[in-house]
């Protein structure tokens, strides 16, 4: 038979054990920290993009809908206009690295990330681009990455195994003129100038070789716009966009992907 003192000793041990467990739990390093550095909690937005099952489901669903809306075969001059970041390339690793170190966005750190050419593909985009190419289509990647980084963007895209060539794909980053054009007739957001140049056959593709330049020197017809931001759609801004007016085109000509990490909002 156990003595009262024995019960007391056991109770003390249990309390000590529980206390140690609590202390250990409180002092353990969160999984979001980098080795040897102070731990920082990731935002819900980054956790959603990098860890949730909902994000790849939604992204893949949008691209499946876009595939269903593609023509059986593209007509001469038809083109799909796409954004790059969080539309084709997934930069959540950059966001995660910055937040893990208690840092936010900076133009220098972003440029350094782009130069690493390590962004992965947004779920569903590979199948979509495969279908565009199979149907004799073309893609214009109108990105607000600085135009001086276009070569790195192109290299990153090719490294991901996408079936892109200088004939079927045009990469065009932003320059000062794109922002300066806003407010001029027909120029509502800072991608509208490049969209207009595309339709006029005046688009300046950074990745286009001399042999392929003639394929982009003719006027093009934009049949679909895909992005993660409402301003990836021509003629609207976050402030001016009328969702009710846009909805008849959503699912046929306009496709918007989820991006909780950043945006014009």
Residue positions per predicted region:
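N-terminal secretory signal peptides that target proteins for export/translocation
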Residues: 1-9
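Non-catalytic pre-domain segments flanking phosphatase-related domains
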Residues: 2, 13-14, 24-82, 265
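C-terminal cap/substrate-recognition subdomain and adjoining C-terminal extension
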Residues: 31-36, 146, 150-265
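Acidic/histidine-rich, surface-exposed loop or edge segments in extracytoplasmic proteins
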Residues: 39-54, 108-112, 135, 172-174
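Second-shell loop/turn segments in exported
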Residues: 48-57, 111-119, 140-146, 178-185
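Structural recognition of the beta-strand scaffold that forms the well-ordered cores
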Residues: 79-83, 89-90, 133, 138-143, ...
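Metal-dependent phosphoesterase signature
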Residues: 89-90, 95-121
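Short, acidic loop-to-helix structural element flanking the phosphoryl-transfer center
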Residues: 112-140, 146-153
């Amino acid at each position: 038979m156990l003595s009262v003192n024995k019960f007391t000793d056991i109770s003390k041990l249990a309390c000590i054990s529980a206390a140690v467990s609590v202390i250990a739990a409180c002092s353990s390093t969160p999984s979001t920290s980098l080795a040897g550095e102070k731990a920082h909690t990731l935002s819900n937005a980054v956790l959603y993009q990098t860890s949730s099952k909902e994000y790849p489901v939604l992204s893949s669903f949008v691209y499946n809908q876009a595939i269903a809306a593609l023509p059986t075969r593209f007509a001469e001059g038809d083109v799909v206009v796409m954004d790059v970041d969080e539309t084709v390339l997934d930069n959540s690793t950059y966001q995660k690295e910055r937040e893990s170190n208690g840092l936010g966005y900076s133009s220098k750190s972003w440029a350094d990330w782009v130069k690493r050419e390590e962004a992965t593909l947004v779920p569903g985009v590979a199948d979509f681009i495969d279908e565009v190419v199979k149907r004799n289509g073309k893609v214009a990647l109108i990105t607000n990455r600085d135009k001086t980084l276009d070569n790195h963007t192109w290299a990153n895209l090719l490294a991901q195994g996408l079936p892109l060539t200088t004939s079927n794909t045009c990469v065009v980053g932003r320059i000062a003129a794109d922002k300066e054009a806003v407010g001029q007739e027909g120029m509502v957001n800072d991608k509208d100038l490049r969209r207009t140049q595309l339709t006029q056959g005046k688009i300046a593709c950074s990745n286009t070789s001399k042999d392929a330049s003639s394929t982009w020197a003719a006027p093009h017809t934009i049949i679909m716009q895909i992005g993660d931001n409402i301003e990836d759609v021509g003629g609207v801004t976050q402030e001016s966009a009328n969702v009710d007016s846009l909805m008849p085109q959503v699912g046929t000509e306009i496709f918007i992907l989820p991006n909780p990490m950043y945006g014009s909002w």
